[in-house]
Regions:
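C-terminal catalytic "cap/lid" subdomain
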Residues: 2-317
Length: 317
């Protein structure tokens, strides 16, 4: 049987079950539960590349950095390095829990994490309008000082204080693509484009430099799925299926959507929440418009059933 290749995108929030379960140990346990379902895919004959979010985790790293700088005079950690730190830590949790589960099932398959840079265009319009809040809240005095001394973009956030905002540019290329392909071809499960990848710009002739930005992890996974010619782009999220008219009396759960329907529902503007489902639908549209084969949205515990066509929302060209 010919192997089928899937890119599975996992949310950074899915490693944090609730407000009371945020520790590293809690996140490891959440990773273990998620990788059981990925092991089911592998046992069913899929090759898998895994992308993941890192929003809360980068927030924790930044907070530690800010506290250490304020209380001990330690140097602060740049945002691109925070991204690299989170790729290593989350990759380690996913890698080890998946390795353990595969070994328990008698499946011999290596698992590897690739610290991944993703190229963005230094002229992307997003750099002119930073909009992604990161880090802790500050008072106005501190915010304005950092704006002046460190060239930060800062905004007042809903009356709760001031925060730094950074750009969220579109991913253009996966710098480590050939390494990722080589590992997949050798039969490995690859954890890559973590947190959307570390955003880098090309100064000249493939001389890369990290930038303070955040790439949407679903868009980075969408790009990866396209570049490695995956048979499936699967977004693992908090809901079993996608709904239109979400939260309204005429709410309807969808088993299947065509690309045209997905674009129509998105354009109508009332179906998908801006910060949660809308970017996932946008990433899938981007994938299918550029030659992608099929996409699936479901929650981790239903991945096995969804692949059998029993649940989840399938999006097709």
């Amino acid at each position: 049987m010919a192997k089928k290749l899937a890119v599975v995108a996992i949310g950074g929030n899915s490693l944090i079950k609730d407000e009371k379960h945020k520790t590293v140990e809690d996140q490891y346990e959440a990773a273990r539960e998620t990788t059981i379902h990925i092991a089911d895919m592998i046992e069913a004959g899929w090759d898998v590349a895994i992308g993941h979010g890192n929003g809360p985790q980068v927030g924790f790293i930044l907070r530690r950095s800010e506290i250490a700088a304020k209380t001990e005079g330690m140097h602060e950690i740049p945002l691109d390095v925070c991204g690299a730190d989170s790729q290593g830590a989350i990759g380690y949790a996913l890698q080890q829990t998946l390795q353990n589960e595969l070994y328990r099932r008698g499946i011999k398959k290596p698992v590897a994490t690739v610290v991944t840079q993703v190229l963005v265009d230094k002229n992307d319009p997003a750099f002119k309008k930073p909009s992604k809040p990161i880090g802790s809240f500050m008072d106005q005095v501190e915010a304005k000082r950092r704006e002046k001394e460190m060239a930060w973009s800062v905004v007042e956030d809903a009356g709760r204080g001031w925060r730094r905002v950074v750009a969220s540019p579109l991913p253009k290329e996966v710098v480590e693509l050939e390494a990722v392909k080589t590992l997949i071809d050798a039969g490995a499960v690859v954890i890559t484009v973590g947190g959307g990848g570390i955003p880098v710009i090309d100064l000249k002739d493939h001389q890369y430099q990290g930038v303070a930005a955040v790439i949407d992890k679903d868009f980075a996974s969408s790009l990866l799925a396209r570049l490695i010619k995956a048979d499936l782009f699967l977004i693992s999220t908090a809901v079993e299926k996608v709904a239109i008219n979400f939260g309204k009396p005429d709410q309807k759960w969808l088993d299947k959507m065509t690309l045209a329907e997905a674009k129509q529902y998105l354009a109508e503007g009332s179906h998908f929440a801006k910060g949660s489902m809308a970017p996932k639908i946008e990433a899938i549209i981007w994938y299918l418009e550029n030659g992608g084969k099929q996409a699936l949205i479901t929650n981790p515990e239903n991945i096995g059933r969804a692949l059998k066509g029993e649940t989840g929302t399938w999006i097709v060209p």
